């Protein structure tokens, strides 16, 4: 059997010779905590941030592969008072740079640096969008939380295919040299209806119950 992220991928799999009755469009399993309903206000209270400010979650994988300082500098030029939840993973050097930048920053944004965290689901519940590499797990967690995605630097192969699927179905945008992060964020936030449309699309395509569906299928086949 082949487990896929969505029914939208069934045709592609069949075209590659996989029998349709062997395709299980259950979605990608994620930790059950990403399925729990957590209000924005509750999530913000847990993090100690303002629930009424536009909040951007910046991630770069567990190794922190992203230039967060450069991204914050670009986004702060938009003029909107954002809150940045900056997750640096195990990249202690990047965490230090973000902490130093935050300590000397004098603009109208708020910067919250983090190292490796275990409460990504809370951060996603408190955020308006996520800026991240398109790794399969992060993408699946964001889908479960209906969190619009701005993606960068996909690895050739599976991450590029993740980007194609998400962008083609209106759930994400790809940050490039010709479509930089500040333009991507501005376009996402300048029209509130667009954010709502993206979230609605994600809720229709996401399978937050993927883990339960897959487990039930396996138990039936025993």
Model-derived features with residue positions:
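C-terminal alpha-helical cap of glycosyltransferases
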Residues: 207-222
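Helix N-cap/beta->alpha junction signal
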Residues: 5-8, 90, 135, 177
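Short, glycine/polar-rich helix-capping loops at beta-to-alpha or helix-loop-helix junctions
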Residues: 9-13, 95-98, 138, 157-163
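C-terminal "capping" alpha-helix adjacent to the active site of nucleotide-linked donor transferases
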Residues: 167-170, 176-193
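Active-site-proximal region of nucleotide-activated glycan assembly enzymes
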Residues: 1-37
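A short, well-ordered alpha-helix in the C-terminal region of glycosyltransferases
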Residues: 194-208
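Donor-nucleotide binding loops and adjacent catalytic segments primarily
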Residues: 38-42, 47-126, 160
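A donor-sugar binding/catalytic signature common to diverse glycosyltransferases
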Residues: 123-161
């Amino acid at each position: 059997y082949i487990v896929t992220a969505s029914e939208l991928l069934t045709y592609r799999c069949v075209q590659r010779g996989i029998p349709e009755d062997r395709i299980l469009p259950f979605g990608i399993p994620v930790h059950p905590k990403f399925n729990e309903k957590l209000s924005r206000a509750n999530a913000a209270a847990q993090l100690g941030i303002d629930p009424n400010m536009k909040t951007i979650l910046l991630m770069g994988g567990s190794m922190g592969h992203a230039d967060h300082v450069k991204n914050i500098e670009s986004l702060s030029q938009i003029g909107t008072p954002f809150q940045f939840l900056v997750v640096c993973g195990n990249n202690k050097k990047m965490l230090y740079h973000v902490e130093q930048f935050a300590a000397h920053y004098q603009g109208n944004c708020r910067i919250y640096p983090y190292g490796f965290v275990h409460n990504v689901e809370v951060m996603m519940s408190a955020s308006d969008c996520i800026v991240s590499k398109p790794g399969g797990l992060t993408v699946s967690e964001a889908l479960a939380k209906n969190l619009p995605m701005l993606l960068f630097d996909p690895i050739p192969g599976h991450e590029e295919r993740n980007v194609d699927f998400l962008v083609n179905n209106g759930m994400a945008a790809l940050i490039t040299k010709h479509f930089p992060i500040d333009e991507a964020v501005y376009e996402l936030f300048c029209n509130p209806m667009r954010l709502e449309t993206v979230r609605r699309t994600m809720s229709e395509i996401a399978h937050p119950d993927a883990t339960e569906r897959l487990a039930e299928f396996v138990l039936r086949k025993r």
